[in-house]
Every structure is written in structure tokens, then in C-alpha cells.
């Protein structure tokens, strides 16, 4: 079995893959254009940010699994992979700690004027800050928009800094908030009003909703801090640039959008660059050795489970619930041809099988099988299955 690795991985990880009995094609500089040629007889494809196009999917006749070394799967033609019966898996949240650490680094830099002081000292200028320019984080209130793995890592660090934490998320309940020692907010604007600092993290696949709009910003306290990491589409940049000046907000951001606005000279441009004391960085969020190692460990786990157990962990393109409306529940003799005969009767009845599951009992004499169907079998088909040699029992259940 061939594994094509189209991203940088340590030699130890490549050796682990080879120890699973695979032939590893290591092409860390592989482009999307060349991938189409190399993927033809590959069973497993590993990528980081390289585009996996519909053409690559079509060319991968032997392709069974695509693994994204990271969380964001926007670079993979998911619909086409699903149509060809190819599993797509990722390594979710292995970057959560790294993103939380950067978020706090940006908060501290905003509060203490780290960049300004470092720049002045580099020029030989001893620039002593005014008393009160840095407020300190202890005892302040942090509003966390969202409550996924990244935000929960931010909360852990906030508590270590003796910061009061508020949180809002569509999925957050008062009970979960209490268990996490944060105060529940029913609405984003409530969080904005009550916070001295606000953090926002938005991965690429969730960037279709603006979380920080003009209304949210107008509700923030004068002089508050806002740090956002991830895709910039989650923040109304024009509103932030305008309101930050009016309300003296301090802004820091790390952006990771694949296509960013540039000037005619090819340089990045943003309304936020002109804001006093604004801090902007590009794709620092997950770039730590700890995050890299966590991702490679998870990548190995995904491929190992697939090769050894036939199970795809972290799969992102399976239906949570199949379109099946009926289920056959059978006890069968564990002998050659019994299940095949059952399937033959289902086919003869013109019914499609959506899912099938089978288990064998101790002694390997009998098995238990469930077959999910897209419509109800005819009475004649059920009778024919019951009469098959090796069928011990049959029950038909409606799926609701």
C-alpha cells in the first residue's frame, strides 16, 4: 500500500509509517499541479495546506483516505471525495494550545507596549512608559467569543493570570459555563459590555459568520482590548478600524486567510495597520514545535487505525445519520454464503442497502447482523430471507 506524504514530516514519523507495511512517497514540496500525476496508485494521501483538487480526486483511482495534517479542510475537494467514496480525516485541535499561547502573547503585548518598547530600544532610545499605560491583566475581565477547544485553553490560562472570564457561544449552556468556572453570557453584546478584553478565534471552515460587527464593537468599553486569531472574515474590519479610533480600542490580530488583500506593489494592506498600537502578525497561531508534534502524533494515529483496524477516526465526510428508513436485524449461522444469500434477496427486491454491520459470537458458529435499507422490503422478500438456510432469526424495524 502506498502513502503519499505531500507535506513536511519528521523522519521518525516516516519510519513509523513504513513500519506499518506501507511504501512511503515523501514529497514535501509537491505542488497541487504535480499531485495529479503521483496520486494515481496511492491509497493514502497526507497533506497540510496543499490543494487537493477535484482533478486529483478523479485521478486517485486507488485512493481510500486523505488525511489533513491539521484542522482546516478547506483545501480539500470534500464533495468530490465523498462522491468517490474516499474518506477524509483531519487532526483537529492539535493546535489549540499554540493558538491560546499566541492569544495571550498578543494580550500581554497590547497591555505592556512590548513592541513599541522593543523598537525604541533597538534604535538606542530609552523609552520609559507612562504610569497607567499598562493596566495589567490580573483582576480584569476577559470575554471569550466561542467555547471550543481553543477557547477552553484560553480560559485555563486566564485563570492562571487571575482573570475573570465571561464566555458566549451558541453551544454554551449555563451548566457548562459554571463547570468551567466562567460566567455565561446569553448574547455577544452582553459579553462586549462586560469585558475589559475580548478574544476571538475563527478557523477557515467557520468563517462564514461575522462575530464582531459594528453593534458588538459599539458595546465594548472605551479602551478595551480585542485580540482575534484566524480567518479575518469573522471581524468587520472596516467597523473595527473606525470604532477603535473613536473608543480607543487596542487591537491585535494574527490572520491566516489563504487569499489576503494586497496593494499594487504586492504588499499586504489592512485598515488596521494605521491604528495606534495595533499589532498584526501572519500565521503565527499554530507555528510551534509542540503543535507540530501533536499533529504528527495524531496523524500517525489516524493512519494506524485505518490500516490495522479499518476504522477512520476524525472522519469529516460521513453522514451522521444515513437516509435509511428500515433495518433488518438478523441472527445468522457463521457459514459461507449466508449473508450473501440475504443480500441477494434484498437486491432482487430492488432495495438499496445504506449501512451494514456484522459481529461474530464466541466460537464462530453464529453472528449478529444489522442491514439498514432505504425502503421497506416486501412481504415476499422477508419470507424468502426467513426461509434461507442459515438464517436463525429475522426482525424488521422502522428507523425513526
Task: Please provide the spans of the model-predicted regions.
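An N-terminal-biased, well-structured beta-alpha scaffold segment characteristic
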Residues: 1-91, 213, 355-356, 360-366, ...
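Rossmann-like adenosine-cofactor binding region
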Residues: 52-58, 171-268, 287, 399
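Phosphate-coordination loops involved in phosphoryl transfer and adenosine-cofactor binding
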Residues: 63, 138-141, 223
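Glycine-rich Rossmann-fold phosphate-binding loop(s) that bind the pyrophosphate
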Residues: 147-148
Amino acid at each position: 500500500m502506498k502513502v503519499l506524504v505531500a507535506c513536511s514530516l519528521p523522519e521518525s514519523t516516516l519510519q513509523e509509517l513504513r513500519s506499518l507495511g506501507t511504501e512511503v512517497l515523501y514529497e514535501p514540496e509537491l505542488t497541487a499541479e504535480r499531485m495529479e500525476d503521483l496520486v494515481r496508485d496511492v491509497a493514502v494521501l497526507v497533506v497540510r495546506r496543499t490543494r487537493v483538487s477535484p482533478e486529483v480526486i478523479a485521478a486517485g483511482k486507488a485512493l481510500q483516505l486523505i488525511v489533513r495534517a491539521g484542522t482546516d479542510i478547506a483545501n480539500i475537494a470534500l464533495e468530490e471525495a465523498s462522491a468517490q467514496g474516499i474518506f477524509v480525516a483531519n487532526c483537529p485541535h492539535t493546535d489549540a494550545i499554540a493558538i491560546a499561547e499566541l492569544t495571550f502573547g498578543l494580550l500581554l503585548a497590547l497591555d505592556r507596549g512590548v513592541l513599541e518598547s522593543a523598537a525604541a530600544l533597538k534604535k538606542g532610545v530609552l523609552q520609559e512608559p507612562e504610569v497607567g499605560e499598562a493596566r495589567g491583566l490580573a483582576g480584569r475581565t476577559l470575554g471569550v467569543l466561542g467555547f471550543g477547544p481553543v477557547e477552553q485553553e484560553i480560559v485555563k490560562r486566564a485563570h492562571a493570570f487571575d482573570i475573570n472570564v465571561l464566555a458566549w457561544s451558541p453551544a454554551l449552556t449555563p451548566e457548562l459555563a459554571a463547570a468551567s468556572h466562567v460566567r455565561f453570557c446569553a448574547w455577544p453584546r452582553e459579553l462586549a459590555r462586560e469585558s475589559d478584553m475580548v478574544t476571538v478565534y475563527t478557523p477557515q471552515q467557520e468563517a462564514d459568520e461575522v462575530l464582531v460587527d459594528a453593534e458588538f464593537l459599539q458595546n465594548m468599553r472605551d479602551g478595551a482590548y480585542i485580540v482575534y486569531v484566524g480567518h479575518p472574515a469573522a471581524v468587520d474590519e472596516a467597523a473595527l478600524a473606525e470604532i477603535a479610533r473613536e473608543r480607543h480600542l487596542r487591537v491585535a490580530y494574527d490572520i491566516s486567510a489563504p487569499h489576503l488583500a494586497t496593494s499594487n506593489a504586492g504588499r499586504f494592506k489592512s485598515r488596521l495597520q494605521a491604528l495606534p498600537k495595533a499589532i498584526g502578525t501572519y500565521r503565527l497561531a499554530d507555528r510551534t514545535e509542540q503543535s507540530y508534534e501533536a499533529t504528527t502524533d495524531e496523524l500517525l494515529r489516524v493512519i494506524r487505525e485505518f490500516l490495522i483496524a479499518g476504522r477512520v477516526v476524525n472522519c469529516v465526510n460521513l453522514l451522521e445519520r444515513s437516509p435509511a428508513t428500515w433495518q433488518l436485524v438478523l441472527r445468522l449461522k457463521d457459514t459461507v454464503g449466508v449473508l450473501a444469500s440475504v443480500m441477494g434477496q434484498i437486491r432482487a427486491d430492488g432495495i438499496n442497502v445504506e449501512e451494514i454491520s456484522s459481529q461474530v459470537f464466541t466460537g464462530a458458529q453464529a453472528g449478529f447482523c444489522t442491514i439498514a435499507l432505504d425502503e421497506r422490503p416486501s412481504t415476499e422478500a422477508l419470507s424468502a430471507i426467513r426461509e434461507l438456510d442459515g438464517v436463525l432469526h429475522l426482525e424488521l424495524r422502522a428507523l425513526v
